[in-house]
Amino acid sequence: METGAKALRLLVLFIASSCVPFAAFAQTTPSGPAIDAEVNNIMTETHSNGMAVAVVDHGKVGYVHAYGIRDAKGDPLNTDTIMYGASLTKMVFAYTVMQLVDQGRLNLDTPLRDDLDNPLPSYGADPVFPDKYGPYKDLADDPRWEKITPRMCLTHSTGFSNFWFVEPDMKLHIHFEPGTRFSYSGEGLILLQFVIEHGRKAQGLGLDVGDLTRANFDRLGMTRTSLVWHDALETNVDDGWNDQGQPQAHEKRKKVRVAGSMNTTISDLPKFVAALVRGDGLSAASRAEITKRQLHITSAHQFPFLQPELPVSEQRKDLYAGLGVVVFDGPQGHGFYKGGHDGGTANTVVCIEAGQRCAVILSNDVRSEAGFADLVKFILGDTGVPYDWEYGDHAGKS
């Protein structure tokens, strides 16, 4: 009888333990010296000249450190060095958009045509920066633009290529029915920026996105972060290195482009990431929308864009677009991430909802990308972040 009771107790304990949520199996963040050693190893392996790393734990910024050099002269990279944020800008923009949703100025599912006073194709180029937005006149004969919503812009499902200027004819095209599938598109986010900046003032639009983001940066104490270059950023600026180890001058972007004009530092950016993972500055509903499974991603890789869909049996079941981020489910539960890349830049932010834990990595050497998967795993443990989809065999290549 006692033996049977003991077996029953063990069975109950086993069932209970198997139902414990992911958060209960908390990962331990490595010490600062351990992170330093791992970063130095990865920099050696990838031939990287510079990296900067920060850790967020329980929604608070923890360890922050910079490694290597910031320019070809050999000046040290430090935590206040201005670095190019690249496509991490998209994550910041999505957060800003959801604040406008909270304020009732935008609705995620209202077609953008309803936010404008005139048809989109009737708008000409910006008088100051002619290439700030897309050539919307190119859509005059394609009524599908009228279906595009803010949600589609933030989930990369507008049907646009990444940018109009990569099209063979240098024109803006819609390649598939808006909202039906994912294909990475900075152009879609630029369209949403246009509507926010030129939309109906009667509903609270006609706003400067640079001002909106700056208000958040000021609130969070991000004193050296901006979506547009200004004089205060002129000191302690990095250069980049391409995959051949050749230095690349830091581009000083004079116009706000939400697809990728942000400059930041490793001291600043984790403050935003911590606020995002906590939901600071957003309603609970808007915070949930950002990391919700919005749209299933069915391609083999993120790039090249406009890839065909994989057969259903080969699609990753947990891979979805969030709003401005990609979401996934792994050994530690639900997570989200965003990357940033250009010829001499490699960035990544990975967050796990359980424990509000994030790794923030900025690099001024594109070759660092090849070590991101190992470094994120070292800091956060096994997350399941889909770097195979993100990079394919292009990690570390310009």
For the regions a protein language model found, what residue spans apply to each?
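Bacterial N-terminal signal peptides
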Residues: 10-23
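Extracytoplasmic/secreted proteins, especially bacterial periplasmic and envelope-associated proteins
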Residues: 30, 34-41, 92-96, 107, ...
